[in-house]
Structures are given as structure tokens and as C-alpha cells.
Amino acid sequence: QVQLVQSGGGVVQPGRSLRLSCAASGFTFSRYTIHWVRQAPGKGLEWVAVMSYNGNNKHYADSVNGRFTISRNDSKNTLYLNMNSLRPEDTAVYYCARIRDTAMFFAHWGQGTLVTVSSASTKGPSVFPLAPSSKSTSGGTAALGCLVKDYFPEPVTVSWNSGALTSGVHTFPAVLQSSGLYSLSSVVTVPSSSLGTQTYICNVNHKPSNTKVDKKVEPKSCDKTHTCPPCPAPELLGGPSVFLFPPKPKDTLMISRTPEVTCVVVDVSHEDPEVKFNWYVDGVEVHNAKTKPREEQYNSTYRVVSVLTVLHQDWLNGKEYKCKVSNKALPAPIEKTISKAKGQPREPQVYTLPPSRDELTKNQVSLTCLVKGFYPSDIAVEWESNGQPENNYKTTPPVLDSDGSFFLYSKLTVDKSRWQQGNVFSCSVMHEALHNHYTQKSLSLSPGK
């Protein structure tokens, strides 16, 4: 069984260093490339670094290049990530991940290691009960909440009635505030009829500060002589999040394909399922977007997607696309904007490299395509042989070079016999700065080699 077990992490001051480890078992470590990926609080996954199985190639995300170093020790079956000059924005859960043998996705993950970069001191949370008024609980159910505010560092655990109450409980991810302290909230849905007869207690445990708080949550009786406290800020109770994705590079560069900008809304509640999309191109509203039927997710929320078809030349000319999302659970609409990276396009240079002599002792060999000097980073690389597509290839993400351009490698794995038979293999590159947006470089075994 494949296992990746991580260690390291913790709380560190800005500017200091930290090392993460990823110990592998259940497979031949020296034959696999393993990546580091991270997820900052409230954000999506971000690729960090990769080192090839033989240690010859290392690539880093722009945000960590020059500060982080990836390394491996095959004798210990361990991958490392040395992090120097750490910044608050490096705060995240870090994962090591291995790609599945036959597919370009991460199939095996470490358990995750939390790294917190902050100058804040350890601080226990303040806990506030969140309860409806007695007049607003007549709908059959009532939502009771618990706001856990201003603590450091992560994590904090929240339970209800000392763990006896688990049904209807939803604890939202922590939010890192501008103060450098964390806040989160937990909500439980209970029958309205149980209020007043059943006791509900929110149990909070913050081990770093050795703080334990038990807070009773009960509805407030409000009348003309009693003013209910204001509701907490909606963002602290969670709510929909919006993500805007650009079209695929290949779609923008081939006239036969249809480029699309995609707006994705997640964490839409059952109570407020209706989502409204408004789309704008360079500030002018357009009405040709298509909204797909909402999909229910494993965490009992909805995911809603709206897709806007764009004109090839509009995207390449740098027009700005804005998705505006409205939902009753949001205090105000959320707007996300996207466009092609600004700057003068630079034409990629393409070089093909045959297998090394040492590799010819193996049953399979690697053909390499180096693509360098291009800008922006939107690019597509494919392989073919004798007019037929080749699928057994992997391409690194574009890497920022010292001159402001990007480079990448694409590696095609083929049986040695196919190479020695003199078959011609071609690396095809699509980029906006190329003539007709396309170029191709071929390689084959030269006679006598």
C-alpha cells in the first residue's frame, strides 16, 4: 500500500526557516517524481515544487522560487522541503503528492502539515454564543452557533455537548484575520421544540494556549424593552465562495475550438440555493452565458457553474471579463475579474532532446521537449508519431525564468523498440506569439546511432 507520511511544520516567525519531510513506503521511491502542494486558509490548492525522480530537474512556483529548496534522499525514501525567509503568506497546510502511474493527477497524498508564519504570540480564543430570538424559531428547526474569535495559532477544536451531539453540526474553516489572529464558527441545527428543554453547550479546546471553554447557547427573549445583540458578520459564519477560471490555452489558439471563461460558486446552502450571475466584458454587461444546473456536494452544499463563451481575439487582445455573483447568503455581491496576462508576447523556442545513452539500457526511454523564452505562460504542448497522438507524456507547469519569460519541459515515454525502429516523434507547441499560433519539432534515431 502506497503511503506518504509527513513530519515537520509548526509555528515560526517571519524570516525564519523550517524543513518538512515526506517519508514514502509501498513503492520504489527512486522511480517516482513527487511534488509539494499547499493550501492557504480559505484558498484553493497551490502547486509549490517538484523534483524529478533522478534529481536532475527541480521546478518551483514563482511565489517560493529562491526561498524554498526541494531535495530527496533515496536511501531513506524521503522527500524534503527546506523553506527559508518565510513570509506570513506562506502560512498553509503543505502536502506531498505522487502522480498516478498512468494519469496526470495526484493519486497519493501525505496527511498534510500545517505551517504557520506569524509574529503573533500564543493567544487563547474568546467564545461567543450565537442564538436566534425566541420569536424566530417557529419553522421547525433552529440554528445555534458558536463564534470562536481571536486565537493563535491553529488549530482549535469545537464539539457540542462534549461530543454527544454530532448530527446537524457544521464547523466552518478558520479565517485568518488582518490582525494575524484566527476566527471560526460552528453551527448546529436542532428542533425548535427542544429549545428550553434541552441544553446545548459549545465546547472549545485550544491546546496551544491550554484554553478550554464551555459556552451554553440558548435563544434570547426579545421584546420592546430588550434589544437583541447584533448578528455577527456573515463572513465569519461562512458562505459561498467564487472562483473564476480562464479558458484553456489550446481553446484560445485554435479557431476550431471554443474558449470559455468559467465562474464557479461553491458552498451554496440549501436555505439560499438561488445564485444569480452577471457577466461583463470590459465593463459592458453581456447575456450569452450559460448557467449549468446546480450540483449537490458531499458536504451538503451546492456547486453552481456559469460559463461564458468568449471570442478568440477578444481574449488574446486582453479584454477583461468580470463575473458578478449574487446570493441571499452574501452581504453584498462578489465580483471576480480575469484577463490574459499583460505584456509583450514572446515567441517560444523549441528544442527536442533524444534519450541519453545510459537510458538505452532500459525497456522504455524518454524523449524530451524543451520550450523556453515564451510569454505569457499560456501554452499547450502535445506529442504525436506518424500523425497519431501520443498520450504517455507529462509536461511541467511553466516556470518563470530570470529574464521574465517562461520555460517548461515535456517528457514522452516510449518503448525502446519503437525508438530503435526509427519512428519519428514530434513535439507540437501552441502559443499566441508563434506564426499561426503553432510550431512542431521532430526527432528520431539517426542511422548508425
UniProtKB/Swiss-Prot annotation:
The keyword rRNA-binding appears for this protein: no
Cysteine disulfide partners in this protein: 22-96, 146-202, 263-323, 369-427
InterPro entries: Ig-like_dom, Ig-like_dom_sf, Ig-like_fold, Ig/MHC_CS, Ig_C1-set, Ig_sub, Ig_V-set, Immune_Resp_Modulators
Positions annotated with a glycan in the UniProt record: 73, 299
A Pfam entry, by short name: C1-set
Keywords: Adaptive immunity, Cell membrane, Disulfide bond, Glycoprotein, Immunity, Immunoglobulin, Immunoglobulin domain, Membrane, Pyrrolidone carboxylic acid, Repeat, Secreted
Residue ranges annotated for the Ig-like domain, each copy included: 1-96, 125-218, 240-339, 348-444
Outcome of substituting residue 435 to A: Impaired ability to activate the classical complement pathway
Impact when changing residue 324 to A: Impaired ability to activate the classical complement pathway
Entry-annotated residues carrying Pyrrolidone carboxylic acid: 1
Any single biological process term in GO: adaptive immune response
Impact when changing residue 302 to R: Impaired ability to activate the classical complement pathway
Subcellular localization(s) per the UniProt record: Secreted; Cell membrane
PROSITE patterns, A to Z: IG_LIKE, IG_MHC
Effect of residue 302 to D/A: Enhanced ability to activate the classical complement pathway
Domain of life from the UniProt record: Eukaryota
Major location (coarse): secreted
Gene Ontology terms: cellular component: extracellular region; immunoglobulin complex; plasma membrane
Effect of residue 436 to A: Impaired ability to activate the classical complement pathway
CDD domains found in the cross-reference section: IgC1_CH1_IgEG (cd21817), IgC1_CH3_IgAEM_CH2_IgG (cd07696), IgC1_CH3_IgAGD_CH4_IgAEM (cd05768), IgV_H (cd04981)
Region (Variable (V) domain, involved in antigen recognition): 1-119
Effect of residue 255 to A: Impaired ability to activate the classical complement pathway
Subunit and partners: Immunoglobulins are composed of two identical heavy chains and two identical light chains; disulfide-linked.
Chain's role: Immunoglobulins, also known as antibodies, are membrane-bound or secreted glycoproteins produced by B lymphocytes. In the recognition phase of humoral immunity, the membrane-bound immunoglobulins serve as receptors which, upon binding of a specific antigen, trigger the clonal expansion and differentiation of B lymphocytes into immunoglobulins-secreting plasma cells. Secreted immunoglobulins mediate the effector phase of humoral immunity, which results in the elimination of bound antigens.
Protein's recorded name: Immunoglobulin gamma-1 heavy chain
Organism for this UniProt entry: Homo sapiens (Human)
